[in-house]
C-alpha cells in the first residue's frame, strides 16, 4: 500500500491512514469463495488489521473514519468518526488521496431492488450471504464475466443455486483470447450454467 511504501521511504515520519470502512486490507478475490463455502473461516480473508499494520509498519490506521473536508491553506483535514459522529481536525505535511474504486452499476430498471447486490468488500459479501440465508433463492444471475463474476457464478453453483451468467462482450474473460475463452464457455455450459453474451459478428 501507499502507507507501507511511505514507511519504507522514511522510518521517522508520522503516518496516519483514514479508512471509512471497518476493514483495512482483505483478499477481495477470496470473497466469492467464502460465499460459496470453500473458505469457511471469515477471518482468513483479512490480510491486515489496524493493530497488525501498526505493529508491522508503525502506521496509525483509523477505521470508521471519513475525511469530510480538506483545508489546503491550513494543511488540515476534517475527519468524521462514523461510530459516534464526532468530527476533529488533523494536520498534514503531505496528503495522499486514495479513496479506492466503486463497482459500475448499470442504470437499468429494478437495480435498486434489495435482492440486487454488488461485490466489492467484506460488508458486500456479508449482505449477499444474509440474502441467501434469509431468502433461500432458487436462481441467481451474475452480471459480468470477469474474474469476480466467474468466481461468484461458481459460488452460487456450489451452493446449489441455479445460475445465469450475463456478459456484455462477446466472450467472458476479455483479457484472454477468443480460443481460450471458448474453452471457458464450454466448461461453464458443461456445469449446467446458463451463459449469455453478445453474439460475435460474422467477421469474428
Task: Report residues per predicted region.
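N-terminal Rossmann-fold NAD(P) dinucleotide-binding loop
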Residues: 149
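Conserved small/polar residues in nucleotide/adenosyl-binding loops
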Residues: 197-204
Amino acid at each position: 500500500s501507499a502507507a507501507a511504501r511511505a514507511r519504507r521511504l522514511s522510518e521517522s515520519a508520522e503516518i496516519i491512514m483514514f479508512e471509512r470502512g471497518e476493514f483495512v486490507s482483505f483478499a477481495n478475490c477470496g470473497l466469492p469463495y467464502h460465499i460459496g463455502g470453500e473458505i469457511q473461516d471469515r477471518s482468513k480473508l483479512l490480510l491486515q488489521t489496524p493493530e497488525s499494520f501498526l505493529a508491522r509498519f508503525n502506521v496509525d490506521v483509523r477505521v470508521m473514519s471519513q475525511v469530510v473536508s480538506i483545508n489546503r491553506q491550513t494543511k488540515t483535514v476534517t475527519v468524521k468518526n462514523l461510530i459516534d459522529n464526532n468530527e476533529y481536525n488533523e494536520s498534514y505535511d503531505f496528503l495522499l488521496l486514495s479513496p479506492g474504486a466503486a463497482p459500475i452499476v448499470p442504470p437499468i430498471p429494478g437495480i435498486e431492488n434489495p435482492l440486487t447486490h454488488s461485490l466489492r468488500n467484506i460488508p458486500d459479501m456479508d449482505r449477499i450471504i444474509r440474502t441467501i440465508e434469509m431468502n433461500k433463492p432458487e436462481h441467481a444471475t451474475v452480471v459480468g464475466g470477469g474474474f469476480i463474476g466467474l468466481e461468484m457464478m461458481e459460488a452460487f453453483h456450489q451452493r446449489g443455486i441455479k445460475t445465469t451468467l450475463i456478459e456484455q462482450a462477446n466472450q467472458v474473460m476479455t483479457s484472454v483470447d477468443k480460443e481460450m475463452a471458448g474453452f471457458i464457455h464450454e466448461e461453464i455450459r458443461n456445469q449446467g450454467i446458463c451463459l449469455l453474451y453478445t453474439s460475435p459478428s460474422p467477421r469474428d
